[in-house]
Amino acid sequence: MRKIIHVDMDCFFAAVEMRDNPALRDIPIAIGGSRERRGVISTANYPARQFGVRSAMPTAMALKLCPHLTLLPGRFDAYKEASRHVRDIFSRYTSLIEPLSLDEAWLDVTDSPHCYGSATLIAREIRQTIFNELQLTASAGVAPVKFLAKIASDLNKPNGQYVITPADVPDFLKTLPLAKIPGVGKVSAAKLENMGLRTCGDIQQCDLAMLLKRFGKFGRVLWERSQGIDERDVNSERLRKSVGVERTLAEDIHEWSDCEAIIEHLYPELERRLAIVKPDLLIARQGVKLKFNDFQQTTQEHVWPQLNKEDLITTARKTWDERRGERGVRLVGLHVTLLDPQLERQLVLGL
């Protein structure tokens, strides 16, 4: 049985700002783009969250909820340096590390000799070391599979951890809301609940063939996760191949103008995320994703040398007109595919 830890830094960007400027600690702050540029919030500290400010929220909405919010543009060099330090701490315990972003990662400590081989003690020691060396807090989840470790890391935030032992898995899953499974958004959860499916226990009673017919590949994922099945390894070789941002909508949209407005809100966040890993914004391809209210989705992309909003809007309009039909749209996403490092090196050498 594997021992997987998911470590998630608490309000990471905001926490770095509060550490470096103690005057920010007790006031609502958020990192994000300006209201004038239709920016979105990257993260907010806990005082801001008490007003309802959340990640991926349009800045204009955040300022309506919290007019005295202190908005910071972000210092991504500082965040990347803190992230590198955290990764160094991880590497003291295992070489099997799979980063999801600057502020979270999976660790496989199945064969780690540290802390008598106890994943619970390793997670606790990692969190304490992060605090001692960076004055930042982290939360952790411990479980036998990746998706449960990720869910567990969110159950005792901030600065805590939650352990799901192999013996705990059946009872934990029985009452686990489907909305907690990564990839199941609010709209999906609502549609499932309309079918009488609210928990993993409900899915356990379903026929897999029915789920496949109703939801396609998504149905298989639901069934497997509800059984506690997640065969994905912690992939330490993983290289980031793409950057994306998407929004699951509270209500389906049927008008192109609504879709275009969402793209306008999403684009600054895509630009910000890409700048962290590719400051020159050079890419291989860019594209859009639309997910419809029948759970089908479509992706359209093409070769493009640099991030470009107008091209994304044109691509989205073409996709909207040609593939939507009469269906409502429940998710809009933007993404870019990064240049292969070897190809990029060849291009640079050739200049």
From Swiss-Prot:
Gene Ontology cellular component terms for the protein in this record: cytoplasm
Cofactor annotation remark: Binds 2 magnesium ions per subunit.
Annotated UmuC domain residues: 4-185
Group of enzyme by EC: transferase
EC number: 2.7.7.7
Intracellular or extracellular location(s): Cytoplasm
Positions annotated to bind Mg(2+): D8, D103
GO terms for MF: damaged DNA binding; DNA-directed DNA polymerase activity; magnesium ion binding
Xref: InterPro entries: DNA/RNA_pol_sf (IPR043502), DNA_pol_Y-fam_lit_finger_sf (IPR036775), DNA_pol_Y-fam_little_finger (IPR017961), DNA_polymerase-Y (IPR050116), DNApol_IV (IPR022880), IMS_HHH_1 (IPR053848), Rev_trsase/Diguanyl_cyclase (IPR043128), UmuC (IPR001126)
Name of the protein this chain belongs to: DNA polymerase IV
Gene responsible for this protein: dinB
